[in-house]
Amino acid sequence: MKETLSSKVPTTRTVGVTFDSVSESKSKLKSGSVQGTTATATATGPPSPPSSYVIKCLLKTARFMWQVTTIPAKIGDTLGTLYRYAQDSVDTFLCVAGKARRKERDGDQNSTDTKLYLEESVLERKLPEADLKALVDLPAGLDYNEWLASHTLALFEHVNLVYGTISEFCTQSGCADMTGPGNRTYLWFDEKGKKTRVAAPQYIDYVMTFTQKTVSDESIFPTKYANEFPGSFESIARKILRLQFHVIAHLYAAHFREIALLGLHTHLNLTFAHLTALHRRFNLIDEKETDVLRDLEVALRLTDDTSGQDSSSSVHEHSSSSSSPPVQHQQHQHQQQHNNSSSTSNSTSPAEALHVNSQSNSNSHSNSSNSHTTTASASASLIDGDSAAPPICTQPEAGAGCKPAGSSGLLGGILGDLTSGEFGDTTRYCTSAVPQAAASSSASAAGPGADGAASAALNNGAGALHLNFSNNNNNNHNLNHLNHHHHHHHHQHHHQHHPHGHHGHQGHQGHQGHHQAPASTTVPHSGLIQCNAAGAVGASAGGGGNAVSAATGGATSASSTA
């Protein structure tokens, strides 16, 4: 037994050694095969899938092209490889084309979703086109930089106010990019000129911060007597207006539904029309920037139309001499609208509302030298003022006052109702509350002193145009310089550094006591453009004929005066 055990021990040991060697060889073979497989997979396997779907398709095609170049062992393999290559080539073409078509469909769907502002129901109320041209025309004798600064400040305030109402809907997650209509994306350029992709709230905050800092700079927007505008002021104003246009484009593309539900779409349309008219008049923004909202310009009839020059002149009763250069137009209708308005009535409000084409003296209203002269280039675009086309703003019934937004849907002569606390008191804007027949009868009963009011009523409710530039930012520039100042530094401005970036502006009363008239007082309103034919009719019926603003106490009483 011992010998047997001793004789079997070497055998067992040998077997064990043999087993170990076999296991070692197997493990080596396995490891070698694994390594070979790994190397093969690394060499012949496809690369990591790219992020782009199109690149994946192209790489897939390149792989089969490599397979065709290899010499197969049999002719059948060659035919099979060629067939697979042809099939994959077709699939590659279809996948790229399908991806492009899918993007196009998605873009069309997004474009349709973001163009709610083109619906007829939200385009029916706005100021007449002719008044917008009169709003931006440079008055005779007024400095161009002063005029441009006033409009820049007004547009900055209006855009900031409208955005402030929906700022809670514009979030980092909901608006990850600063987008505009047509899948337009805006990138922010920092101080070093580096492009940065930021979210829409941050982009708009940058815009408002930059604008507020710029308009508060005394060296750029001078308010003191000894200071002058810098030579580069126009380029700075162009940049501010371009950035404000980006904000407007984002509001239309991403938040127009909320704005329409709040009843503020008319104010946004009016702000856009104001900016477009100013840009068209002085060519301030590149056409590539404004192309994204060109369809809205067409819907609002703000596009260039050479045939609209004659009709615009007929609406305004412009007298343009054929021998005089085409760059100057005498605006007689607005002169008639303010024939009986004195110089004190033009500056009674502490907010210094702009009476477009107002007279510097009530005793010289018949003198044509006091009418404002438009200075424009011969190639300047004219806003379509087709008198044959009916106004979009519908006229309410006689004796019916302005109703708040929502009481009559989108109908009526109201341009909007601002009820937010950020806008101060409730302020309503009406194009007209008196039909043409009633306005004509009241004007004829008032006598010849009401010619301006009658012409305003017959102009489809165009009325006397009022613009308040100095409610929320006392950094404004007096736009009645033609009547009261021959230099833009005769008055003091106080730059109230209010919170930028759509924080609610509180109305600061500026120019206190500068042009006070004990005869009439006007409470500052929200600062948006007012078309107030009813005020002119009511004043003419009373015998005064003053086309002053009827917005007293923060609300426009349009029909109570009729």
UniProtKB/Swiss-Prot annotation:
Domain of life: Eukaryota
Region described as Disordered: 30-50, 304-378, 468-523, 538-562
Keyword Ribonucleoprotein: no
Alphabetically ordered keywords of this record: Cytoplasm, Metal-binding, Nucleus, Zinc
Binding site for Zn(2+): C170, C175, H250, H255
Compartments (UniProt record): Cytoplasm; Nucleus
GO cellular component: cytoplasm; nucleus
Compositionally biased spans, kind Basic residues: 482-514
Annotated Pfam families: Mob1_phocein
A GO MF term: metal ion binding
Bias (Low complexity): 31-45, 305-349, 357-378, 471-481, 547-562
Major site of localization recorded for this protein: cytoplasm
InterPro entries per UniProt: MOB_kinase_act_fam, MOB_kinase_act_sf
GO biological process: cell morphogenesis
Coiled coil (residue ranges): none
Family: Belongs to the MOB1/phocein family.
Job description of the protein: Required for the normal morphogenesis of a variety of polarized outgrowths including epidermal hairs, bristles, arista laterals, and dendrites.
Subunit structure: Interacts with and activates trc, also interacts with wts.
Protein name, UniProt field: MOB kinase activator-like 2
